[in-house]
């Protein structure tokens, strides 16, 4: 109660005292390394359908840059909408062991997963972020969706809380000094859950070194002789039958979805399939995969018949 009275008293005194205080700039960017991003996605996928969380290691380079170089998972149990608080004993032991392996970076924030329901902060997440910002005012909360994330597009966002005193005094939570911090269109779920009122979104970028680019290009790369291997005909026939059955099921799902879209309003269509499987995309991918496998097996069979 006393803190609320002091806050109201400061608001009545005017905004002149708040004018000289440093404000967060909207061009502030969070740079996440490839290693940290892969670890977050893998941790989130393994925990599906439950939420998982972990801590991010890095440094605050300047007033506009937060660099995340690595992450590690926390042994927290989660539900469908929240995760528990951080275990300080595990965090201290993990930080000590990481320093011995040449990882002296500090904790710059935390991450957790929202499997299938978008990137936003719940009330429990806001309380967790408040505890982080009490220790480090510039701490960042990263939310990743491992279900909606696909190859080439990661559903991820970074947030930080808005000081309630700035809202009471009618001030903007961030100042604008450049056009670097362009505003990404927020999702409806994030706006409903307090984006722009209780917390704001930070820009995310990914910096890759030459070695990291080589590592990512070779991540799922097959050797040159892999395409010349001739698969067993029985196993290839079984795969083709399974692929055809899957394509039949996906085509039925897509037909049913198209028929249902006629009866839905535009507002219902906007949120009807959020976090659900898109049968059309999966059908295209399955057809392309089946064609590629059959073409490569036919070419390998022809080469083997000519060579041997």
UniProtKB/Swiss-Prot annotation:
GO terms for cellular component: cytoplasm; nuclear periphery; nucleus; proteasome complex; proteasome regulatory particle, lid subcomplex; proteasome storage granule. SMART domains: JAB_MPN. A motif (JAMM motif) lies at residues 112-125. Zn(2+) binds at residues 112, 114, 125. The 26S proteasome is composed of a core protease, known as the 20S proteasome, capped at one or both ends by the 19S regulatory complex (RC). The RC is composed of at least 18 different subunits in two subcomplexes, the base and the lid, which form the portions proximal and distal to the 20S proteolytic core, respectively. Acts as a regulatory subunit of the 26 proteasome which is involved in the ATP-dependent degradation of ubiquitinated proteins. Transcription factor pap1 is controlled by the functional interaction between the positive regulator pad1 and negative regulator crm1. Both these proteins are also essential for cell viability and for the maintenance of chromosome structure. Pad1 is also responsible for resistance to staurosporine, and other drugs such as cycloheximide and caffeine. Belongs to the peptidase M67A family. This is 26S proteasome regulatory subunit rpn11. It comes from Schizosaccharomyces pombe (strain 972 / ATCC 24843). The lineage of its organism: Eukaryota, Fungi, Dikarya, Ascomycota, Taphrinomycotina.
């Amino acid at each position: 109660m006393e803190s609320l009275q002091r806050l109201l008293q400061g608001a009545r005194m005017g905004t002149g005292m708040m004018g000289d205080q440093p404000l967060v700039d909207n061009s502030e960017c969070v740079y996440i390394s490839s290693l940290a991003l892969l670890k977050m996605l893998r941790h989130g996928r393994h925990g599906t359908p439950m939420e998982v969380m972990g801590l991010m290691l890095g440094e605050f380079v300047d007033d506009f840059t937060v660099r995340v170089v690595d992450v590690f998972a926390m042994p927290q149990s989660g539900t469908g909408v929240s995760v528990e608080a951080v275990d300080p004993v595990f965090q201290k032991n993990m930080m000590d062991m990481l320093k011995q392996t040449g990882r002296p970076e500090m904790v710059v924030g935390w991450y957790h997963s929202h499997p299938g329901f978008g990137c936003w902060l719940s009330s429990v997440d806001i309380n967790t972020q408040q505890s982080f910002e009490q220790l480090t005012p510039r701490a960042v909360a990263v939310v990743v969706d491992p279900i909606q994330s696909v190859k080439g597009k990661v559903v991820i966002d970074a947030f930080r809380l808005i000081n309630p005193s700035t809202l009471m005094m009618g001030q903007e939570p961030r100042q604008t000094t450049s056009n670097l911090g362009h505003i990404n269109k927020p999702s409806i779920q994030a706006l409903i859950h307090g984006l722009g009122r209780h917390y704001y979104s930070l820009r995310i970028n990914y910096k890759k070194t030459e070695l990291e680019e080589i590592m990512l290009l070779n991540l799922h790369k097959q050797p040159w002789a892999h395409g010349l291997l001739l698969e067993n005909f029985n196993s290839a026939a079984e795969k083709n039958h399974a692929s055809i059955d899957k394509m039949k099921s996906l085509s039925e799902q897509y037909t049913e979805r198209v028929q249902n879209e006629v009866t839905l309003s535009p507002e219902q269509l906007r949120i009807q399939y959020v976090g659900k499987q898109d049968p059309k995309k999966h059908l295209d991918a399955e057809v392309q995969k089946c064609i590629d496998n059959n073409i490569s097996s036919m070419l390998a069979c022809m080469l083997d018949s000519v060579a041997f």
